[in-house]
Amino acid sequence: MLLQKLLWPRVGICTEDRLYYRMKAPSFRDEGDILRIEQGERVCFDTYFNSVSADKWRRYTAAQNFSLRLKLSGKLRVVLCSRHFINSQSVRAVLAEKVVQADSVQEFCFDFPKGADGMLFFELQALSGNAAYCGGAYECDAAEKDVQPVKIGVDICTFRREPFVMGNIARMRSDILENAASPLHNHLEVFVSDNGQTLDYDKLNSDTVHVVPNANVGGAGGFTRGMIEILKANENGAGVTHVLVMDDDIVLDTDVLLRTYTLLSLRKPEYADVFVGGAMLRLDRPNIQVENGAAWNQGQLISHKANFDLTKVDLCVANELEERHEYNAWWYCCIPIAVVRPDNLPMPIFIRGDDIEYGLRNCKRLVTLNGICVWHEPFESKYSSSMYYYILRNQCIDNSMHCPGYDANALKVDLRSQVMGEVNRYRYKNADLLIRGVRDFLKGIDWLEQTDAEALHKEIMAYGYKAQPVDQLDVPFDYSRYLYATKEEEKNKGKLKNLKVKLTRNGWLVPPTRENTVVSMMHMTAYNAYRVQKVLNYDSNSQKGFVTERSKEEYSRCVREMKACMKEIDTQFDAAAQSYRERCGEVRSLDFWKKYLNLDK
């Protein structure tokens, strides 16, 4: 049975060769995926996409007796290997080797020893000058009775991200939906909720792609609409067994869907409720992993295996070490349909935290696997003041239901830390949004149920900082100062700096000594604003920015509002948290969502 295809770098997907194979000499690929190998040269496939995590396949699935099928020409030594993580590094072991020869491209099969574990892979060494590798696959044995029926319903929520969405749909059409040779053919349908209402429905809709207009009610509302459409399709016999929630601004290799499908098809009965999570890799640096599963930690998020360079073999092996997962973000998360019930839909919290809450509520076991991933725009490309309203508000909502130890005092600590962090950056509007988010949480679940989320979001967006072309701002952009500011925090670490900051409240108790500075919009630290009058917050991607200014009046106003909010927390937190804990079912039912999304009209 096919386990994993051996993948190639692809223009438009990922061109980082070392995620697929490693060789010292420059690689020469002909059209049609043929890798020419110079005599004496060795190619290793102990890589993120082209190795097999045997331990996970054995633990979670019925897969047994792994084998390798390769298309080769010329004379080559084929070496079957494994790697294990021992004492903080991976250790290579040779399991078997064989010399093969063919005058033209020929298919060869190789069996890994029974019981082979760890990360399985192979190496090729060219023994002639005309050697070539032309692809292949890993296979396994599995009894027919152990293969379960699986059909995946892809749930995409989009808001004006046409290039990404259209590209991913086109790839799914050509590789799967309209490709009868694909194992996933007839086992995949795509459901798109168009929150921006800008897609061409007549052009996109078909028997297997379903695009519907939706109100702009954030990711929570968009993904929930997709779930509702999938439940409706199942009533008409669609037979979807798993809902794959997937962001609209990702790049997807469709083989990831096939690996997910195979994993689910072979899963053991005791893992019927397993979630499959895809890792997030950076779109701008495609070998760098942002997250591979995560823990909530009462809002102090822990992104597992963050910043792993997956071209490093030791990190590929370490990436498969299992940790305690509480959720997987919804850039790629596959959920059993048994979980997606009419009485168990997401919370209507618009954005930031809907995936976390749903995972905390439902994810008993999350499986991640090397090679199951998407490439996503880095978060530093997405600065928005509006997030300051949602992040802390939704943290409070999520903790009310899932972390009873998070009390009024814990919230006051978080509020003070975040508000003063923004005030010390002169970002007073962000501080206001943090406070407003907490005050809205304190109104309890009735407020959430009755609020027009789309109108509220427009108001929040209008209030925050808006980036403008820098030539329209009164602080000129200076690249040398921008570069200095990105390193300023590192240069000024130490006891003297810390004492200076504390004694002067980050410079508020002493006069400014610099007229202005230029900082990174996303990565600015409070120390960047130390004794500066004006700050240009600059985004290098858009080459836009906004200016904030030191103001003791604004400082005092924000501190007063924060202290007033803390008093409100003392008197209102317990009742608000209790309302979410006891009545959350009211806002995650199908009846509620139909009304919320105006689907009853």
Language-model segment annotations:
Residues A306-C333:
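A recurrent flexible, glycine/aromatic-enriched loop bordering the glycosyltransferase active site
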Residues W330-Y332, I337, P342-L360, R365-V374, ...:
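Donor nucleotide-sugar recognition loop
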